[in-house]
C-alpha cells in the first residue's frame, strides 16, 4: 500500500542534493531514531558502483519487527536495486520527453514497449512533467530518500538535476515475479484509465518494469512525486459532534466519497481487472475480453486502449505462489462475463479450496515446511467449497425486491484501499490525488465492501439518549463504550448518506439484508489469518437463520438453505470461534500477525517487555499477577 508520509516524516528524510561529481546521497532514517531525531542517516556512493556495500543499509527493511521469524521477514523485504540502472532509465525518458514535445497537442499515444524491457507511458512523458536540463547535459540522480516502507512496497523519492523529483516504487519480493507482473501491469493500466477516462487525479506514471530483467533489476514503477499532506491528517473518527474540527471531518468523508463516485460512474462490460490492450502482444488473447471495456467511446485515441483481463484482487493471489499458475489458478481468475456476477464468489471459493488441498498434499509429501495443522486446512476446504456452492443462490439477480438491482450488478471499478491514508492533498493547488490502485478490479457494486476507515459491524447506536435507557445514569466506563459505538455508527451513517447523495441508484447496496447476503464473500476477501475461515462460517450460519425470510421476500434463489450443517458442526464452530476470539484477546499483536512498529518495538525491548529467545524469536513478557 502506498503511503506518502505525513508532514515532518518525509521532510526529515529529504535533504539537499550532493555536490560531489558522480556521487549521489542515499538517505534513510535510523530505525532507533525515527521518531526521536530529525537527522537522517546519509551515505555517499558513486553512481557507477552498484556493489558498494554501504548501500545495503539503504535497502533493508527498518519500519518494524516481527515477534516470529524477524530475520526472515526482513530479508523478504530487502529491496536492493540498481541506482545506475535507474539513472539510465531517467535519461531514456528524458529523451522520450523531448520527442513527445513534437507530438500534436491533445494526442494520446499508446504505451511504448522499450528495448530494455521497460514500458513508458509516453502520454505522461512530456517536458512539463519531466523537467529540463542544459543541452549536452545528462540526467543525474542526486539524492535518493527512503520515505516509506509499506505493507507491499518500498517507496523512494528520487531527486535529480532536472529540478523535478520522482517516486520509485519497488514491490517487496513476497510473491513470485508472475504475480508481481500481473499486479503491476493492471495497476498501471487502471491508473491510466482513472486519469484519462474517469477524470480522477492520480500521480502520473512515467515508466515501469514487471520483472528483474530491466536496468533497475527489480520490478518497479516510476511516477510523479506529489508534494502535500495525507488527507488522513484531518480524519478523527472519534470526534465529538459539533467540534471545531467538524469541517475537516466532513471534508474527509466528502473527498473519499467523491473519489468513489467517480470510480463507479462508468458501467463496464466484464468482471476482472484492467490492462492495456497492447499487453495482448505478449500474452494469451484468451486472457482478455474481446469486446470493448465500455460502450460509447468516441475518442479514437481511447478506443481499444484498455481491456478487461484476469482479476488481480489480492485474495485471489495471496499465498498462492506454490500453485501451478496455468492449471490451478488461471481457471479461477476470470475475466467473467457481466451476465455472471456470482461467478466471482464461486471462483473465489474454488480457488481457496484448491489452495488448501495443494498445501495438504505438499505437507503429506514432505515438501512443505510450513507450520500448519492439517485440520485447519481441511476445515478451510469445507468452508470454501460451501462458499462456492452457495454462490449462485446468494442473490436472486432478477428480484424486484431490491431496487435498481441491475445497476447494482453492473461491472464497476473497485479500489480496495479507498482510504484517507491513500489520498494526498497537493500543497500548492490543494487538490486531492488518489494513490495505490494495487489490486483494483471490476466487480458489481453489490459485492463491494465498505472502505475500512468507516466500516463497522458492531451494535448500531444512532442516538445515545434515545437508544440507551438511562444513559446519563451509567458509569463513565459504560458511557465511553456506548459513545464509541455511537461514533462508529455515525461515521458509517455519514458515509452512506454521502453515497446516497452521489449515487442514489446504488444506495440499496448498504441495506442490512444485502450486507448480510454478501458477508460470507466479504469475509473471504478480507481474511488475513489462517483461522479466519471461521468468520466465513459464522456469516454462513447467520444466513442460515434468516434464509427462510429472505426466500419469502424473493431475495435469494432457493427456498431451502443450500448448505447442510449438523448439530455437531455448529457446536464445533462455536467452540473454534470462541478459541479464535480468546487468542486475539490474549496474544499480543495478534491483529498484526506479530508485527510491531519499530519505535514501539525498541521501547518494549529496552524496557524488558519483549525478550529475545535463543532461536531469534521474541516473546512478550506477561505482567505478574497481583496477589
From Swiss-Prot:
Superkingdom field: Eukaryota
Compartment(s) where it occurs, according to its Swiss-Prot or TrEMBL record: Mitochondrion
GO cellular component: mitochondrion
Transit peptide: 1-43
Chief location of this protein within or outside the cell: mitochondrion
Key words, A-Z: Mitochondrion, Transit peptide
Family of this protein: Belongs to the AIM9 family.
Matches recorded under PANTHER family: ALTERED INHERITANCE OF MITOCHONDRIA PROTEIN 9, MITOCHONDRIAL
Name of the featured protein: Altered inheritance of mitochondria protein 9, mitochondrial
Organism: Saccharomyces cerevisiae (strain Lalvin EC1118 / Prise de mousse)
